[in-house]
């Protein structure tokens, strides 16, 4: 579905005259791409404006959000700010800066906004239809990546960095300023795409003096990171409504313990005394704390088991009181004990918590729970969209509630939307932004449907099918089977700028997206089955989906493509598919499980999913094996290649590299050299193996990219190589 044209006409007419007062040299604006044949291309994908981070004004009447635009020739994107009424009318662009603006936040009086630009915090007055002159209000030499204003905006918490555990040559000898090296004596020396030469820290400062001299480090002398790397931001901290307390999530571990443990605790920092009160410090990930409206309750997302990064995401609730002037935890309870899926992105509204979750329909929905754990789904089960957590909730007439959120589907990227509900029943939804309608209306639209297939063990597997525009079942089409990353994730109504299924369909391919074992929308048993069984049932699920597609009378050739765990799946299926697939594409995949164990950074993932399945345990000071087959160097390593656990033994024995003598199908291997999650040598090894077996193969390595391909021209090259390979072997 594409929304009606009315919103686009308002927006485009406005942008021609309702402009901010100044356009900086180097500004990147909306694309004016013209499409004559209705076919989406990789250039079209890069032309879309990308909406993010909507923020409602204090009076609830306006919404401020950012949009990123891309300039392929300049090889960069730039994010600027837009403002509209809460219903989407009177849209105007209020910044046209040459460098990106992020983390835009309203002042409590609604008359100005704060934001980050070039690593510092700025403030600008908002008057009428334009943004006034911005003024830098921070001076932090190490830069600021995120922040949160206190409720009264007299103070601010901000995120910056301090020197990390990894040393460089000048730490050894200041005269060695031309030497290049990284020096470490412990694990966790690199993370995601960077060497840990810096550690993020969170500070509190008065709004009038945002500088090191007037800032207080929340962690004091503790040697930990806050927020948690690599993706944590200010959402991991929350001011209490009275501004006296800050709740935060922190993994209070370093080195080997950090590398093997997922234990992130919840803490409360008292700003007056500088005292930290632990709320919950056991188990796995505890993240995203949010206070209720009067500061008497704190909710957060919690995983029960330490070492399992894909454990069920529960909603925990703590009752908070005051004793001797400090916050005290009275009780903690779970609100989702009877909910068999993951909860995400909590938002309070009165005595209810709204959240999002993947559902058995293969879509993401908005739900709510009361304080007794009674959960109801608010978005209609028949709506084939992914809805995200609300950014604003407003009581409406006749007892109804309007939920302002974001959504997308396979056919369009993120837009702002209002969902109206009454009690537990959905009433309607209305799209309130139309950022990309001028592009979408030029494109022919694919169609999608949900199907269910019977698996080899008699269960039902939900799959999405996406058909090219003007699909004609009397004709023959090439097809693509998507093998999912994660491995814990879901093929949903997802619109991605890296793996865009609509783009695949618009190149004339039928796209099959099976939700095999390990996906997250179908309950814990379905999700957890994959841990310790990488070579097993989920591979049979993929073969079931592939055989179904290949049997369709309108399907000719079939490709199999995937990234990360999907790349592992490609390498595995290459060795056992027979003649089902006509070509393969792997991006950032695991090829050699043993090599992966010794080179990845987040050891908890490999430890658990290779068959460890026991909680984190560590005894410092031990050297070598304990003799129990799972403990080495004092660390429980039941998923290691030298462990004796049956699942680990099987995983390494059946690693994709052990099946290369069966390889015979053309394969393309992508990898980024800055990928420290699945190091790029995995891609080199897979390509080398294909070459040694005489298999038609190609290798594309990106020296500056991580697990994802981000830079515009690299993205364009990736897509050109991707479709060139598909077309060569499937058309």
Predicted regions and their residues:
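Conserved beta-propeller blade repeats
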Residues: 48-63, 98-113, 141-156, 189-196, ...
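Short glycine/acidic-enriched loop and turn motifs that connect beta-strands
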Residues: 69-73, 163-166, 253-256, 304-308, ...
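Active-site-proximal cap/loop segments of hydrolase catalytic domains
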Residues: 513-731
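Short loop/turn segments that connect beta-strands within beta-propeller blades
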Residues: 85-89, 125-130, 207-211, 270-274, ...
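Predominantly five- to eight-bladed beta-propeller fold
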Residues: 21-28, 78-79, 161-215, 219-220, ...
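Hydrophobic or amphipathic alpha-helical targeting/insertion segments
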Residues: 112-169
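Beta-strand-rich domains and repeat architectures in extracellular enzymes and scaffolds
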Residues: 43-79
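Cap/lid segment of the alpha/beta-hydrolase catalytic domain
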Residues: 433-557, 563-564, 598
